[in-house]
Amino acid sequence: EITTEPEGTLESMINANLYSAYHTTRGLITIMKENKTGHIFNMCSIASFTAYSNGGSYAISKFAMLGFSKCLRAELKGFGIRVTAVMPGATKTESWDGTDEPEERFMKPEDVAEAVFSAYSLSPHSVVEELLIRPQLGDI
């Protein structure tokens, strides 16, 4: 909950989930523009477009990441650079360690990777702008 988060949580989440991608991408865009090719995948989240209780700073940072992805798409499409916002739901990673949720409520990381590779494998004439992947049993 936003009102009970420790001081500095928002800054930490923005640093991890937005600024790191922002600065890395800025460092690579020049060469992508020169080559007139490239594909940027930004790891967003279901939290990028769906607010939920206890989402707090994490959700805020992921909303920002989706906005960043949309800006990049608009700015770079004329250079042949594709941009995909990847928005996975609950995926069985370390962030869910200790949860009581049964394993079938989660996607496998390999499923997300395969979906990303499928988007990457399209011809240069197509782009998956937003890749939304959810567990078969729905969001947690």
Q: What is each model feature region?
A:
Residues 88-98:
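Short, flexible catalytic-loop segment of classical short-chain dehydrogenase/reductase
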Residues 25, 61:
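Active-site helix of classical SDR
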Residues 78-81, 85-86, 101-140:
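C-terminal helical subdomain
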Residues 45:
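Residue(s) in the substrate-gating loop at a strand-loop-helix junction
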Residues 3-22, 37, 41, 65:
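Catalytic Tyr-X3-Lys loop
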Residues 27-36:
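A short helix-coil junction within the Rossmann-fold of NAD(P)-dependent oxidoreductases
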Residues 32, 50, 71-81:
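Active-site-adjacent segment of SDR/Rossmann-fold oxidoreductases
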